[in-house]
């Protein structure tokens, strides 16, 4: 995905989406998908269906029919006999304070424990760094409060994007501040399953943004681990020019 190119599609054709997911699940369950040229050389140990994610180059919680979409996909999961197939929603957390959004997300729980994941972005510990990452004047405290509100009702995975800005990473002080935000969420009764620390892996729209090298990303993640009581996992980036 090239972040320098504007999104092509802005509308969701609900019935088309449901039909396409139904057809894809049938291909996967039957094994027919591995006979197609694109997937024929997939190693046997990788031939599995992990999850269905509500994500993409947009914000799922802005979709008015998100709750219906979650229900429809949950029904398809049951139809195809895939009880272990996870449903995942990725969100920037801006709308998690809205009751209609929370009601939609609560539909994830119907499959029982382990049947879903909700990934919420928390990319900063301080307001100045957050504004630089967001590219606009948003309240970091609002994001933290929204995640805490949601995490009291649903298990949440925190996604923390750690890039460089003009060649400099956020530094250890920012990571300690981020730990404070995470502890604020758990201290308010929020259930955080995991923190995913990652860096850029594709070309960003902002030329000032770059990738943190693997060893340095490990150092920053270790600083976070020292100050939180939830698991922290690291996902390395790649140089998109190569």
What are these regions (language model features)?
Residues 1-114:
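Conserved Radical SAM active-site core
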């Amino acid at each position: 995905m090239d972040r320098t190119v504007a999104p092509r599609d802005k509308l969701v054709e609900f019935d088309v989406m449901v039909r396409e997911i139904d057809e894809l699940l049938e291909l996967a369950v039957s094994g027919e998908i591995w006979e197609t040229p694109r997937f024929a050389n997939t190693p046997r140990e990788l031939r599995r269906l992990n999850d269905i994610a509500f994500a993409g180059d947009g914000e799922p919680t802005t979709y008015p029919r998100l709750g219906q979409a979650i229900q429809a996909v949950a029904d398809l999961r049951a139809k195809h006999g895939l009880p272990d197939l996870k449903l995942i929603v990725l969100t920037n957390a801006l709308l998690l304070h809205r009751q209609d959004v929370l009601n939609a997300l609560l539909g994830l729980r119907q499959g029982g424990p382990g049947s879903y994941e909700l990934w919420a972005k928390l990319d900063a510990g301080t307001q100045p760094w957050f504004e630089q990452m967001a590219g606009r004047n948003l309240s970091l405290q609002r994001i933290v409060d929204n995640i805490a509100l949601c995490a009291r009702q649903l298990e949440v995975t925190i996604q923390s994007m750690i890039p460089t800005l003009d060649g400099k990473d956020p530094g250890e002080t920012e990571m300690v501040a981020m730990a404070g935000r995470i502890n604020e969420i758990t201290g308010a009764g929020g259930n955080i399953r995991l923190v995913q620390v990652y860096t850029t892996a594709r070309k960003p729209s902002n030329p000032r943004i770059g990738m943190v090298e693997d060893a340095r990303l490990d150092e920053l993640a270790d600083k976070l681990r020292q100050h939180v009581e939830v698991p922290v996992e690291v996902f390395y980036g790649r140089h998109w020019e190569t």
